Design a protein with these regions (language model features):
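Flexible "arm" and connector segments at domain edges
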Residues: 1-40, 44-102
C-alpha cells in the first residue's frame, strides 16, 4: 500500500528532484543538449525512486494520465489550444483517477 515516508525520506526525495530540476534549468540556459538529456534522465530516475519509496507504481499512474490527456482532444481528434499553446480540455475529457494505484 502506498504511503508517505518519514520526514527525512520525504525531504530527501524533494531535494533530489529539486537538484535535478536545477541541473535541467542550467543545461537549458547553457543550451547544452547533452546536459539537458542527462538532467531529464536524472529527473526520471529520482522521480521513479520517489515513487518506489512511496509504494506508487508510476508506470500505472503514467498510463492513466496519458489516457486522460488523450481525452482532451476535440471531436475532430485534434488538440484544442489556448492562446499560449497549452492543450485545453476537450468535450470527452476525463480526470485521471490515480487513487486506484494507491
Amino acid at each position: 500500500k502506498a504511503s508517505l515516508s518519514s520526514d527525512k525520506i520525504n525531504d530527501l526525495r524533494i531535494n533530489l528532484i529539486e537538484e535535478e530540476l536545477n541541473e535541467f534549468k542550467e543545461a537549458i540556459l547553457k543550451k547544452d543538449l547533452k546536459e539537458v538529456a542527462d538532467a531529464l534522465t536524472d529527473i526520471l530516475y529520482v522521480t521513479y525512486g520517489a515513487g518506489h519509496a512511496f509504494g506508487i507504481n508510476l508506470d500505472d499512474c503514467f498510463e492513466e494520465v496519458q489516457k486522460s490527456n488523450m481525452s482532451k482532444l476535440g471531436d475532430d481528434g485534434k488538440p484544442i489550444y489556448d492562446e499560449k499553446g497549452k492543450v485545453m480540455k476537450g468535450p470527452k475529457y476525463f480526470k485521471p483517477d490515480l487513487t486506484k494505484f494507491l
